[in-house]
UniProtKB/Swiss-Prot annotation:
One of its GO terms (cellular component) is plasma membrane-derived thylakoid membrane. PANTHER family: ATP SYNTHASE LIPID-BINDING PROTEIN, MITOCHONDRIAL, ATPASE PROTEIN 9. It is found in: Cellular thylakoid membrane. The keyword Thylakoid applies. Keywords: ATP synthesis, CF(0), Hydrogen ion transport, Ion transport, Lipid-binding, Membrane, Thylakoid, Transmembrane, Transmembrane helix, Transport. One of its GO terms (molecular function) is proton-transporting ATP synthase activity, rotational mechanism. F-type ATPases have 2 components, F(1) - the catalytic core - and F(0) - the membrane proton channel. F(1) has five subunits: alpha(3), beta(3), gamma(1), delta(1), epsilon(1). F(0) has four main subunits: a(1), b(1), b'(1) and c(10-14). The alpha and beta chains form an alternating ring which encloses part of the gamma chain. F(1) is attached to F(0) by a central stalk formed by the gamma and epsilon chains, while a peripheral stalk is formed by the delta, b and b' chains. It comes from Synechococcus sp. (strain CC9902). HAMAP family: ATP_synth_c_bact (MF_01396). This is ATP synthase subunit c.
Length: 81
């Protein structure tokens, strides 16, 4: 792999992780804020709200993990060889 392709892979890997973390990070903050607000309004529903929140946070975090997998493939699997 030549140096330009190697440099482009490193830049693309950085962008993949960075951009894949922005959306879920904003979504997780919004969801957590909504959950805290919902628990403050209705404390007796805390268990149900917490369970739903944790499930949705796991789904959001999976998007970030997909970005990490793409970055690792770009760095170590050498798809351009």
């Amino acid at each position: 792999m030549d140096s330009i392709t190697s440099a482009a892979s490193v830049v693309a890997a950085g962008l993949a992780v960075g951009l894949a973390a922005i959306g879920p990070g904003i979504g997780q903050g919004t969801a957590s804020g909504g959950a805290v607000e919902g628990i403050a309004r209705q404390p007796e529903a805390e268990g149900k709200i917490r369970g739903t929140l944790l499930l949705s946070l796991a789904f959001m975090e999976s998007l970030t993990i997909y970005g990490l997998v793409v970055a690792l493939v770009l760095l170590f699997a050498n798809p351009f060889a």
